[in-house]
Amino acid sequence: MKPTLYTATGECVTPGRELGKGGEGAVYDINEFVDSVAKIYHTPPPALKQDKLAFMAATADAQLLNYVAWPQATLHGGRGGKVIGFMMPKVSGKEPIHMIYSPAHRRQRYPHCAWDFLLYVARNIASSFATVHEHGHVEWVT
């Protein structure tokens, strides 16, 4: 049985089916929120990353969510506990970007794709990055 998790506001979240796993953690369906998924870290992230995730969730808005699968709520092992993951919108029906930018993949998947489509994709990617920058989520380190 998977553990019950809690949002920062105390809502219960129960992880469902595992959708994928990577080096940092795993992504699960959420039983209570069918349009969202939970990324749960294998080990709790450092305090600085926990703070960053809380800031990201607090500043999620329609403009960001139009472009990116963005953290909408932090997840905790207990009420008021450490951040061990986050909720984000469930994305389906999308292609990994390498299917567009890799010529070999593009020829397989989109054989009639022309430059106008590639420019359209590039413009959307640029808009995504601009939106993230406008929301203050990029730090310049010198």
Indicate residue ranges for each PLM-predicted region.
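ATP-binding glycine-rich phosphate-binding loop
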Residues: 1-49, 64-67
